[in-house]
């Protein structure tokens, strides 16, 4: 079990749809297997799954989950939990330890939206900051996932998509697979 799953806490449909969609797309692009939403927002789930269908991969989204139940089940299966928060240990101070855990275990990464429930800090195995300053949760997730996987996340190949980018130094090249 070396999967990466995102748990998005407190998504507010009227306010956070775009950011939550970008959290999911960033996670997908950097190698996560799926995303759990504590809010039952089907439109965000459908939007992300449309992108996955078009561009490939097996990324999934489940909405309306209980964070306590998901964390408990994840840990029972042998995984560990990282909560991204500006109040945690700065990433350079705990990265090696987390990478060592990740060698044999899956990681659930908690990304908050609104005020994070206080029990999250105790449920997480690691409370990790990316800089101990307020900034974007999307940036924190991207930096954390890249560092966790030592840059290998950028080499992931997405199979089964309708579209594929052909890398080009100048211009744009996209091919249709169907």
UniProtKB/Swiss-Prot annotation:
Where is the protein situated, by its record's location annotation? Answer: Cytoplasm
Q: Could you tell me which InterPro entries the record lists for this protein?
A: Alpha/beta_knot_MTases, tRNA_m1G_MTases_N, tRNA_mtfrase_aTrm56
- Reaction equations catalysed: cytidine(56) in tRNA + S-adenosyl-L-methionine = 2'-O-methylcytidine(56) in tRNA + S-adenosyl-L-homocysteine + H(+)
What are the UniProt keywords, alphabetically? Cytoplasm, Methyltransferase, S-adenosyl-L-methionine, Transferase, tRNA processing
Q: Mind listing the GO molecular function terms for this protein? A: tRNA (cytidine(56)-2'-O)-methyltransferase activity
Give its E.C. classification number. 2.1.1.206
Where does this protein hold S-adenosyl-L-methionine? 84, 112-116, 130-137
* An example Gene Ontology CC term for this record: cytoplasm
Q: Which GO terms describe its biological process?
A: tRNA nucleoside ribose methylation
Please tell me which top-level EC class this enzyme sits in: transferase
The family annotation for this protein states: Belongs to the aTrm56 family.
* Binding partners and assembly: Homodimer.
What is this protein's function per UniProt? Specifically catalyzes the AdoMet-dependent 2'-O-ribose methylation of cytidine at position 56 in tRNAs.
> What is the name of the protein in this document?
tRNA (cytidine(56)-2'-O)-methyltransferase
Q: Which organism is it from?
A: Methanocella arvoryzae (strain DSM 22066 / NBRC 105507 / MRE50)
């Amino acid at each position: 079990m070396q999967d990466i799953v995102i748990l998005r806490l407190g998504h507010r449909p009227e306010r956070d749809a775009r950011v939550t969609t970008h959290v999911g797309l960033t996670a997908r692009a950097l190698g996560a297997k799926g995303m759990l939403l504590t809010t039952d927002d089907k439109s965000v789930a459908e939007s992300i799954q449309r992108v996955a269908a078009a561009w490939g991969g097996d990324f999934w989204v489940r909405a309306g989950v209980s964070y306590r139940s998901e964390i408990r089940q994840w840990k029972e299966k042998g995984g560990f939990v990282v909560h991204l928060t500006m109040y945690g240990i700065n990433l350079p101070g705990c990265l090696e330890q987390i990478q060592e855990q990740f060698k044999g275990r899956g990681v659930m990464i908690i990304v908050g939206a609104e005020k994070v429930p206080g029990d999250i800090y105790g449920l997480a195995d690691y409370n990790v900051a990316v800089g101990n300053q307020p900034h974007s949760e999307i940036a924190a997730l991207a930096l954390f996932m890249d560092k966790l996987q030592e840059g290998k996340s950028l080499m992931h190949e997405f199979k089964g998509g309708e579209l594929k980018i052909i890398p080009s130094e100048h211009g744009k090249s996209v091919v249709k697979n169907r």
